[in-house]
């Protein structure tokens, strides 16, 4: 996805840009690695701002790849240093985006491979199912686990998510740090367009 660049940051429901291309959005808990993953996929460490502070992404960020596909970095859910009112605001914009965006082809739900699904992730999965939103699950920070532990976590998450009518297979894993799994995920994204 070389040539992908930041084009817009949206903080309210009336400002969504219309690129006329398919969109793939990335969601997950705060600090799961959404921005780092976008940087790895686009091979540009400066595309998406990253931070060790949870809740740093407080708007929906759009990255356009040569007019072919848009990658969308959604604010993290869960812990944030933002005020409750600000958090409610950007989560409302995110919900509106997910429910109304016709260009959205796939949501990629990121789960920290060291932690697995937390209750808030399971709640989000239920919400996606209730609203008929197609999604994939990708485990992040795979470089932090041994091959055996990673395989066990993939199986665990697969079992936890089983029965999802809108879950698209397979569950994948990536490491933004080492680059493992990035090419495979980019290929999977290209299949959405």
Swiss-Prot record:
Alphabetical UniProt keywords: Cell cycle, Cell division, GTP-binding, Magnesium, Metal-binding, Nucleotide-binding, Septation
Keyword Cell division among record annotations: yes
A Pfam family this chain is assigned to: MMR_HSR1
Native species: Anaplasma phagocytophilum (strain HZ)
Gene giving rise to this polypeptide: engB
CDD domains: YihA_EngB
The protein's name in its UniProt record: Probable GTP-binding protein EngB
GO molecular function terms noted in the UniProt entry: GTP binding; metal ion binding
Family the UniProt entry places it in: Belongs to the TRAFAC class TrmE-Era-EngA-EngB-Septin-like GTPase superfamily. EngB GTPase family.
PANTHER family, A to Z: ENGB-TYPE G DOMAIN-CONTAINING PROTEIN (PTHR11649:SF13), MSS1/TRME-RELATED GTP-BINDING PROTEIN (PTHR11649)
